């Protein structure tokens, strides 16, 4: 999304409600979808309009007064409205005209939904072979249960309860496995818990989500170490993760990327305490675990970024004998991390990087030699090395 429509950290309740309605909840109503999916979306729209934004059947009548205000004209009708009524009218005005026409009936109706009780499954929810949409929505529902518990705990302010109500309104849609909505909602659910969970219980509240992400990423690197196994065919690279697992990894990357971007936004707004909480949460997921999972999902550039972040975070103090400027650190990587870099550079066709990596260690593996020879166009030599690697692998299996 561009800057005008992005889901940023500082959206008000009215702005976030409008974007959820426009971008997600209106789709079932505009399409040919029927049954529980439409009912769930309609109920969520009703809850957002009536219970979060305070819209009523009379709200559309105040739209002309809002338009007068936008033209910088004096409006007695606008001045007579309360602050809550003005926020409701502004939210209503922010909706597209087609959307306003479609959701108008929900301002004067009172639909009901059966609140089905779902068990709070233990973490991690991710299991090998799980469907992506099912896993993502169950994760969002797990977070909603914690937000609901925090809201009902008695210590929440009026503003916190209002935001919690917003995040809980779409629960019926998650029961219909709306993965796109769940993916957009999870960062906001985590943000709410990070900012408002009591310090003494924050770790226990957020630990299941960290465990969830680690479970996905750990499974992504299980099927055989990509950098250690011979390529399946020339140029094929390492074995790709399964489609569902790759989607789960991409969702994890999206959540961490979003929270990282929000950390920067909060720093710019001088909200340093909130930014520190976000940073601590995102840094709890090991960078090298992210890098290995990214490489197996085919995201070589992302893998390189994670390795570079890891190198920056673990840079050692500079010994006196190294001729570096004050404040600089010499970055040294273990052999397994250099091997991952080698595999990633091979994916993005960066032959010059192989020269630099070669200077970081005295020997390379046969698999890495195959990769370098392929990039140099020396295919006969690459085939010979590949055959040698296969023979060594067969010998180890026989031994």
Regions found by a protein language model. Give the residues of each.
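Eukaryotic intrinsically disordered, low-complexity segments enriched for acidic and Ser/Thr/Pro residues
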Residues: 1-399
